[in-house]
């Protein structure tokens, strides 16, 4: 066992000196016994980040460094951080180094995997396209998810990213029935607890592994927890040949933690203070999320947008890796339309007649055209009022307002707050509903009948109730 000594501790950065010729490799895990964490041996894992010269290595800690002193021994494990993987992890909550944090005892996993791995080669990747049904109208119609693809949920603070993601977990895990891996990266611990309890109640937890590195963790843990979750997902894909769902909330915190670590390591900051290696760090993570000839990983990632600015380097770099982007908009949330998806800003690579069929594609495009016309007319309406519009424009506005309201939907995961039961709407029902609105079949119904309903039949029922009143 190669043993060094701590020579310096600055927050989560630890310098360790080793004997001549005994330096551990970059990314190796080094263990230290920190009495502040608990009574166990080797309870603090640090990762080698730099070789400084004079046999010194600089490491980033995965847990608190309070209680460490100079001169303490540090053991080189000779390998990167390895975590337990496989069926034994299902139904459990792990931290960045694979230790359980749910109080249900140790994980007796037969297999372990390093968190740093190469992305699959060109030849191993699978490029066939299949649509994944989510049961959320606005997403299934306008931003269809590809199975084995990567989707991003973009939005500022409080636009509803986490709620949309929790609904996805509920709907896809319930109806798709595959294995899910959830990475909680630098988000609120309360939300992580909510998700766990919800999964326990619904029974989905039996098919899910939760990997948490929440806001309270040091930057080293937040920068690595998504890699731990990815290793768990890769095992199910590569070894067990499964189709895996990977949920990451929030990928921005991965970037944010990377920028903290980068500053601590003394690297020059780049644009807006981010790390100079922003594109590389994100690329190494995203390229591992892919479908191979053995199985697939379908990823849904929340992306926090600082100050609602989509040109910020973190969200802008993330855009390049995704097959589709669901943009959550504050003005739409202000109208009370949830999910607050912007139907004109959101895009999907597979919104294509070859993949979706001619009818779905035409309806989706017609919905976008109608909403765009309404958006263009809003200035005229604000200045001159509705009466100055032509009859054709009045009809467009009338239908657009119905479409806008019909894009809202009650969620299962929000039922406890709204008092309205959630609705799962199949893709054919979604397409039919919007097609009939566009054809003018419901021009005589009041627009409020279309707000917060599931299928179109429910809107018709609601309209009847309004008429009876």
From Swiss-Prot:
Q: Which UniProt keywords apply?
A: ATP synthesis, ATP-binding, Cell inner membrane, Cell membrane, CF(1), Hydrogen ion transport, Ion transport, Membrane, Nucleotide-binding, Translocase, Transport
Query: What topology does the record note for this protein and the membrane?
Result: Peripheral membrane protein
Q: What is its EC number?
A: 7.1.2.2
Task: Please report the name of this protein according to its UniProt entry.
Answer: ATP synthase subunit beta
Q: Which residues bind ATP?
A: 155-162
Reply yes or no: does the keyword Transferase apply: no
GO MF, one example = proton-transporting ATP synthase activity, rotational mechanism
| Catalysed conversion reaction | ATP + H2O + 4 H(+)(in) = ADP + phosphate + 5 H(+)(out)
Query: Pfam families given for it?
Result: ATP-synt_ab, ATP-synt_ab_N, ATP-synt_VA_C
Give the top-level enzyme category.
translocase
Give the signal peptide range.
Answer: none
Q: What is its main location?
A: membrane
Extract the SUPFAM superfamilies matched here.
C-terminal domain of alpha and beta subunits of F1 ATP synthase (SSF47917), N-terminal domain of alpha and beta subunits of F1 ATP synthase (SSF50615), P-loop containing nucleoside triphosphate hydrolases (SSF52540)
